[in-house]
Amino acid sequence: MRKFLMAACAAVLGIGLSAGTATAASAWASRTIVVRPGQSIQAAVNRASPGDTVLIKPGVYHQSVQIRTDGITLRGSGDFYGGTVLVPPKSFPKTLCNAAFGPTGVCILAKSVNPKTGAVIRSVRDDTVTGLLVTRFPGNGVFGYGTDGLTVTRVTAINDGDYGISRFVSTRTLFADDVAIGNHEAGFYVGDSPDADTVVRDDQAYGNQFGIFIRHAREVQVTRNRVSGNCQGILVLDDGQRGGAGNVAIVSNTVFRNNKFCAKSEDTPVATQGGGILLLGATFSRVAHNSVTGNSGSQFNSGGIVVLSAKMISQGSNPNFDTIAFNSAFRNHRADLRWDGTGIGVRFVGNVCRTSVPPGLCH
């Protein structure tokens, strides 16, 4: 998926680089634009100005939505069946998002992008998506690219083809009180952001390939999430790009029975199963006060809390200056705690567990 994204940005976003300039919010009184079943959500979004709310009444909407205006709130009437449900239309609109990133439920896209490189020139700022169920999209559920200050809250993404709830090349993101179930790649994804300044909290991730996936990003907080039934619960990956991955705080999460099997693929060159929390080449990261239980498998990622070099997998870094502290880890296989011995400044402190590789990491 990521390879496709990077190539598509240069090839497709050049078709139409910039969104129209929105009128300043101060020139408008904030409005609520109501959408009812049978009406177009996109038409309401196109009418909205900074500060406006697009309120979607309960119902099933066969629609795909693109947002490129600052300060819009897209508010559904509940992230459950019987609330506001977005499902794929028979024919997807020819938006830049759908062309570049695959058919997507809700896409929040930068105002301006470099046509040659896909680099963000001008972010879209301070948008909110809340109260929706987004399901069965061949691409992504909710997808942000080139956003600043994006909030996604009380959204459920089920059985989407790539990512459930994700953001690329963005900063100041909040994913809170969301649910991601059965998405083909990651339930929650934070990537390609050296200054992510992102919080993923109080979310639930079940039955995805990766529950919560942090790749090529720094300054991320992952806290108070419940993660179960995935091939890998929480992953921080240095994929070899400049800047690496790290400065991630994974704190007070419940990570249990992530025992789904995922075969290797073009995007994932090794099979995965039974992984709780994995730091793969991450640096300057902290894993603390988590409950990690019942994650079992025989793959490279298998175990409760696992710290490995990314050099062999993705030509990334060794796991330098990471701290694994005061976690509870039990009934995990290949071990409750695993470290391949690479890197410098890696510390295991006060962890309550029974098995570790190498021996002696448990308190």
What are the functions of these language-model segments?
Residues T32-Q39, G71-P138:
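Right-handed parallel beta-helix/beta-spiral solenoid domain characteristic of secreted/periplasmic
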Residues G38-A43, P50-T73, S77-T84:
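N-terminal extracellular ligand-recognition/capping segment immediately after the signal peptide
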Residues G14-L17, T21-N46:
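Right-handed parallel beta-helix/beta-solenoid
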Residues A25-T32, N46, P50, T151, ...:
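Post-signal peptide N-terminal regions of Sec-secreted extracellular proteins
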Residues S77, R122-R136, D148-Y163, T171-A186, ...:
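Right-handed parallel beta-helix
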Residues M1-C9:
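Bacterial N-terminal signal peptides that target proteins for export
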Residues K90-A119, R136-F143, N159-S166, G182-D195, ...:
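Extracellular beta-strand/beta-solenoid scaffold signature
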